[in-house]
Structure formats: C-alpha cells, structure tokens
C-alpha cells in the first residue's frame, strides 16, 4: 500500500509542478498548436496554445512507478518485473512517436507532422518488439507476460497455439500490432476538446487499476478461495495504472477549458499504447472495448462518417469525431466534455460489473 501511495504522489506532484514549467518553456520556444482549418470555427482561438504536454504525463508515470519500485526494492528486495517494463515500454515508445509528430508540426508551423507511413512503420516496429518480448521473457511468477491468444477475461477464447509455437508468435504479433494501432488512434481521436482525453483516460485507467489489483489479490498460487488468475505481476500493473490516472488528473488541472496546454500526440499515443499494453498483459483485450468504450465510440463515429460519405457523398454526423457533432448541435465545449466523461464512467462501471460477474461465475459462487 505504501508503494502505491508513493507512486501516486510522485506522479501527481510531477504533473502539477512540471506542467507549468513546460508551459513556460514551450512559450519561450514558440511551440504552439496549429488548429485544423476544417474544424469548428470556435477552435481557432486555440491557435498557438502550448503543446507537447504529453511529455510531462509520460515522465510522471515512469518516475512514479520508479519511485514505487525503488521503495519496494529497498524494503522487500523486489526487483522490477517484465510486465511493468513492457507496459512502460509500450507507453514510452508510442509517446516517442507522438513527440516526433508533434515536434514536426510545431517546427513546420502546420498541422501535419509525421507521414502516415512513417507513423505506421514506427508503430509496427515498437508493437512487434513488445509482442515478441511479452511471449518469450522469463518471469519470476512463472506466468508469461502475455498469452498467445484473444481473451475477453483471463482465459483465451481463441488460442494461437493450434499450429505450433512459431505460428502462434506470428499471429500474436499481428494481433498486438492491431491492438496498438487501434488504441493509440482511438485515444488520439478523443483529444479534440479541452480536457476530454485527459479526463476520459483518467477514468479508464482507474478501471484498469481496479482490475489489476483484483487480479493481484486473486493470483493463482496465492489466493485461498475463488477463481484465480494466471497473470504476470498484476501489482506492478495496478501501480502503473494508478500513476497514469493521477498523471492525467494533474495534467487536467492545466488542460481543462480553456486549456493552458495540450497533451498533443505525445500524450494521446502514449496513453493509448499503455491502455493497449494493460489489456494484453491482464488478458482482457475484449473487455477493454467496454472499459475504453468512449474511445471506441469516437473511433466508430469517424469510421462511419468516412465510409458513409465515400458511399453516398452524404454525412451521418455534422462533423466527426462525434464530440464535434455535439458542438455543432449547440452544446458548449465544457458540456460535451463533462457529459462524455460521464459516458466513459458508465462504460467503466459496466466493464467492472462484467469483470466481477465473470469472477463470481468462475468461482462457482452463483450457486451459494
């Protein structure tokens, strides 16, 4: 518990203190956000707002976990786990891609950064490294960091081992690449209104913190009753999820409307990468679609809009992603954001109810 508190406080302090420092640095460098011309006209006043705020979020999560890990090492001798290292690798690597994209935008003074091909190549490289290591690295718990299959909760409903180990690794790499691309882009799409991405991500990571901590207390070989999970080092994952949640909370202090700084692709891609990693390592890849339901809705609205327009030359929404649709319907930006937070909270509560119900069912407690 003390290790968790240390991690949370470290992450929160870093974002609360580091964000205003970054705002001043970005102001001096004149690295402001460039707003898309085809967006809502009301957003043009945001032109020049400092960006690259995701740098602080990433540092806060990494250093928060490091502080927690250092305390545990000094008090219990516990060493860093591969589960934590790979989760942070997913976050940092996607954050680096986002930083390169953001930096290119502010240097070129336009809203176009990395090419689609360049971003895709980077995602493939980092996701593949994550996937391969997650299957092959040894762990003290005896459970692999990830399992070669697709899972809703814990047990894979589709195992990739049906055709041998090599084929399983190849299929898992493809699956992880899809998840990383999907979640990084989904979270990125939600970063269109002040505070929307930070607040929604905070709620989603609280959901994963609860899931990871529950798995820790019901870990196979340690729990005395009920269904147990064969998950690698869920305590570390819970601490990282908590650090991510409070990092988003601290950043939200400066990112709420009117925003003093934007997280940029540095933040949104990093948060998406971490969310994907947590879903993979906790064996909840499909449950994640409910836990991160708001991001799924944002993505679907964009896909539907583009697909329908190409087919009929008409639009389903006034503008996509869907948060812009409600803006153009007359909702204030703050109203859209708060209501979307509420929607995300309902998704997380629903996901946790399903997660707990699954545990109760597998534990055979429905019959008592």
From Swiss-Prot:
**One biological-process term from Gene Ontology?**
cell wall organization
Output the CDD domains linked to this UniProt entry: GT_MraY (cd06852)
Q: Which residues form a coiled coil?
A: none
Coarsely, its chief localization is membrane
The UniProt catalytic activity note for this protein reads: UDP-N-acetyl-alpha-D-muramoyl-L-alanyl-gamma-D-glutamyl-meso-2,6-diaminopimeloyl-D-alanyl-D-alanine + di-trans,octa-cis-undecaprenyl phosphate = di-trans,octa-cis-undecaprenyl diphospho-N-acetyl-alpha-D-muramoyl-L-alanyl-D-glutamyl-meso-2,6-diaminopimeloyl-D-alanyl-D-alanine + UMP
Question: Where is this protein localized, as stated in its record?
Answer: Cell membrane
One cellular-component annotation, GO? plasma membrane
Keyword field = Cell cycle, Cell division, Cell membrane, Cell shape, Cell wall biogenesis/degradation, Magnesium, Membrane, Metal-binding, Peptidoglycan synthesis, Transferase, Transmembrane, Transmembrane helix
> In which pathway does this enzyme or protein participate?
Cell wall biogenesis; peptidoglycan biosynthesis
Cofactor list = Mg(2+)
Q: Which domain of life is it from?
A: Bacteria
List the transmembrane segments: 2-22, 51-71, 80-100, 116-136, 166-186, 193-213, 234-254, 256-276, 277-297, 340-360
InterPro entries recorded: Glycosyl_transferase_4 (IPR000715), PNAcMuramoyl-5peptid_Trfase (IPR003524), PNAcMuramoyl-5peptid_Trfase_CS (IPR018480)
Q: Topology with regard to the membrane?
A: Multi-pass membrane protein
Question: EC no.?
Answer: 2.7.8.13
Q: Which GO terms describe its molecular function?
A: metal ion binding; phospho-N-acetylmuramoyl-pentapeptide-transferase activity; UDP-N-acetylmuramoyl-L-alanyl-D-glutamyl-meso-2,6-diaminopimelyl-D-alanyl-D-alanine:undecaprenyl-phosphate transferase activity
Q: Which PANTHER family match?
A: PHOSPHO-N-ACETYLMURAMOYL-PENTAPEPTIDE-TRANSFERASE, PHOSPHO-N-ACETYLMURAMOYL-PENTAPEPTIDE-TRANSFERASE HOMOLOG
Q: NCBIfam families under this entry?
A: mraY
Summarizing the function annotation, the protein's role is: Catalyzes the initial step of the lipid cycle reactions in the biosynthesis of the cell wall peptidoglycan: transfers peptidoglycan precursor phospho-MurNAc-pentapeptide from UDP-MurNAc-pentapeptide onto the lipid carrier undecaprenyl phosphate, yielding undecaprenyl-pyrophosphoryl-MurNAc-pentapeptide, known as lipid I.
Give the family from UniProt. Belongs to the glycosyltransferase 4 family. MraY subfamily.
Protein name, UniProt field: Phospho-N-acetylmuramoyl-pentapeptide-transferase
Q: Which organism is it from?
A: Bifidobacterium animalis subsp. lactis (strain AD011)
